[in-house]
């Protein structure tokens, strides 16, 4: 097996039994692919910007004399790169330029004669670009656009579950949902009449829409009903017989066939009777005339002579009507075939309640419903109806919608127009009637075949189209104004509405979210999130249980575990590991093909719709050596149900056992032993883990850690293989392998590392190289670790030695007892970086000034500021310290005589400005790590800004010079090799200046050309360097683009080191969370017989009721893994021979069942083995994949190999008394995370502060510097104790008795501790509210 550079250094023992048929796909592809589709030119014009332009252009003037056509578009280069955008607080975007063609037609000449054509490139605003990690930088902050799960366009049939009508009758409905345009609903009422609604407005009889489509009553009936023919023969009334139609009816007369009575009067017609009639081949039977009474005529019958209407279509026949038909000479007439069972008379009944009789009346009725109060004209009514469903500008089903529509109506062809047709509407009504008749089923709305994913690209395209449509209206008006000869396309188009629409979407849409950047996992998960909320989606209040529930089609598509707790449960989901979207936006999951019981390696992606057709076995089905399915009956899934089938019936099989879960859930070892509720908490809490100071890989992992670390983009991955040429803390240089070089390039890759930057959640982002000079790396290898990664693996927490035992009540109710040593070793210390900004504005009274000259502030407070009034980098500051001195001019006030005197003596300055400096918020302490000053163009830069500018220039020059030197050395190295090969000596070359080498001649012509090419490269490199430096210099020197009225912004970055302390929240990966109750001295902790104390003590009662047994297995396996590491450590200390080490390692990696993944130590070189052994001293990392993990006997075997008790329990001693505890205790290693719920951020106490305006009560919460709520139950407590005075002051002077509290304050100042309670303000509010209801309340004093 080939290992990557970092894998080889620390090989993880894998307990998985199944081979990986499919590698874990790139985890961010849903974001990147979608946006790529939006941005890249699409010649077909089906999606992206191209589609948006083509749908709006060409724009024709109202008169038709001019037309604006779209030719093509191009995106320019972004001005600033991603990092610069983040620092400057601007959007990372590229300008969009569109080539438009304006065509003017000659009005006088024949139609279509072109008078003039003008072409021009027009600027259409900025389009935000996606970074390579799938995020957007909007106004300097990283944001993620979450994908949306919405109802797919198409046609859906449903019923109301009997909730609408009091009788509990089930009412069916059909709904045609377009991608954009009006919704069309058909629904039955309790009397079985069919109605139509447009856009959920007032309902109309469904026949109205058919009349508006120009159907007559006859045509409507012919479309929806079969007919029965009656014929008058020799004075008898004969009926055409279709025997099947009589099923279930009660004969009202004798049914006679070939002279024999088959069914007697009053008997029910059964299947036997029908068979008899079919056998006798009877085509007509005689019926009494009364049988026809009440039947409904299928056609209009007009008198051949007089032309008057004898019977109209849909008229119920009477004896008289039948007689009239005979008289008029109609020997044969047809009636509608209906029955109660499966041929209801719905459409016929609906026609009866329909008041309209012509197309015009129907159109007017629809117009009145859509535009109540407007007088309808024929043109307006026709135009409105045409625009509703038949105009491609107003209505679009989209390709997805058309595909779903045609599939649901069982059509062969899946393509068609985006608008509706007559047939579409009629067929929907027919299908709805079929469902009402019991011949078809309703749809399942929550089936993933009926819900699709709308990703970034598609949503951005829709927003862009909205902007274009706004522009279209303006352009049409301008084209009609005349004088077009002088206008150019640029004069017609205003880019504002377009950029406003795009900006609004990226900046403030519900689905554009501030990226969760706690750790790499939270980034990846956020980008893979699927939300049912948002514009065009559901709302929290409306969503019921069904939508939130796990559906069988979620299998392998959406994770059944990872979803938030609380009001959003089930509405926000996460993509499963292997899931992807297909061209229509439906989720697909991969399956291996099974042919005649033999599993192949062929993988097919199936959507939820396709999956229903197949029989699918699970990934852990037993197989033979040659890949056949072993068992007689195999558990499998078919049509959303679990069943057992024979091997030859199985068509597909899961790709991997991890297929059903998301990335976060796949990181939980022994997930299969955890209760789902706890697993949900576990996967959610991993996203809140704060990156620790030194990342520590999990001893017990799942093998998924590497994929997350690499795909998240926090690590640095080598793009091409080569040798490490240079490495330091801030850059890595790789000399690329010869075979990966592009022709004519220097062959040097330079990777700059991110150092100590702030993340969205104020955690620290820092990259550290994990390679050594001169080592070879391959493409795709991790060369530098980021936050929460360790040797290219995700490392969210720390491996701590845990004991499950009670300890003096300090672990009551999930509290956690922690060893002091964990604090000393900085195991759970985290770094947080806060950004504080000071803005200097231009006020009415004059500009605010940033200065060190602040009125009424002592020297001590200014000691950390430089002469510009800005804090030094490296200063240690605490709450209340001034970071940036700033003074604001204040208005002239009336002065007292004393002040006038003081001003006369001491001059003007101090009085006309007030101190508005930026201070460190209360409770914050830390070190200033960076200061940035942004100055508006045209405002003179202060000394500090110039210093920073000089420093940046210096650094940029140094970086570029080093980069240039490295590349130049590469070029000279290649030319040197060429010249040495051509026979020049080392000495001669060394004597010459290196630039002169290019002037030497080589006899071999090909080599000479190569040398000349290298010389050209050198010249290009030099020019490139100068250009880059000039660009950099221009960017650094130019003024900043600040908001209107802002002169200067100073940003100060504080780094805070937070050690673990009581009150911090910690958690394992199994939903086992708790708060630290005490940091216990090392000597008091329970320890083993060798005197090694445990790091952390957990409560054993937290396990049984929560049913997350995975944590116990993790602890046992962790103990074994650590034991192996300690055994290796002992071998190193005993200086055992290398071959012994190899043998032991081989024994460890071979342990387990025969299917377990093998590692061949023999393949590794001696150096590799030494590195590996050195890294394994701290413990052997193991992987136990989800649903395919280590078995109990394997854990025991590993414990045995590590010379540890197989029970995983040891005797512990009490650190305080030295006595052994009565029972053995489960001790082992658990991976514990420190969550971003730190007590420092929550601690808060109010002294005096602001009050709410209406109730005059103190505000609540830390952000408002609020008080603690003294609630209902607290009042009861004081009442119960009879503490009347305490209660009185709580409800008055300490809360909202305005006069009382001011008096109280005054009294305390005077040293008089009395209180005079008055009327609480909230009581006055109550009085006012009662009065507002019209009830007068007066307070009478006794």
Curated annotation (Swiss-Prot):
Gene Ontology cellular component annotations, sorted alphabetically: DNA-directed RNA polymerase complex
Keyword Transmembrane helix: no
Gene Ontology molecular functions: DNA binding; DNA-directed RNA polymerase activity; ribonucleoside binding
Disulfide-bonded cysteines: none
Annotated catalysed reactions: RNA(n) + a ribonucleoside 5'-triphosphate = RNA(n+1) + diphosphate
EC number: 2.7.7.6
Alphabetical list of InterPro entries matching this protein: DNA-dir_RNA_pol_bsu_ext_1_sf, DNA-dir_RNA_pol_bsu_external_1, DNA-dir_RNA_pol_su2, DNA-dir_RNAP_su2_dom, DNA-dir_RNAP_su2_hyb_sf, RNA_pol_bsu_bac, RNA_pol_bsu_CS, RNA_pol_bsu_protrusion
GO BP field: DNA-templated transcription
Keywords: DNA-directed RNA polymerase, Nucleotidyltransferase, Transcription, Transferase
Superkingdom field: Bacteria
Pfam families membership: RNA_pol_Rpb2_1 (PF04563), RNA_pol_Rpb2_2 (PF04561), RNA_pol_Rpb2_3 (PF04565), RNA_pol_Rpb2_45 (PF10385), RNA_pol_Rpb2_6 (PF00562), RNA_pol_Rpb2_7 (PF04560)
PANTHER family per the UniProt record, alphabetical: DNA-DIRECTED RNA POLYMERASE I SUBUNIT 2 (PTHR20856)
HAMAP family: RNApol_bact_RpoB
Family the entry assigns: Belongs to the RNA polymerase beta chain family.
Function: DNA-dependent RNA polymerase catalyzes the transcription of DNA into RNA using the four ribonucleoside triphosphates as substrates.
Subunit structure, interactors included: The RNAP catalytic core consists of 2 alpha, 1 beta, 1 beta' and 1 omega subunit. When a sigma factor is associated with the core the holoenzyme is formed, which can initiate transcription.
Protein name: DNA-directed RNA polymerase subunit beta
Record organism: Aeromonas salmonicida (strain A449)
Gene designation per UniProt: rpoB
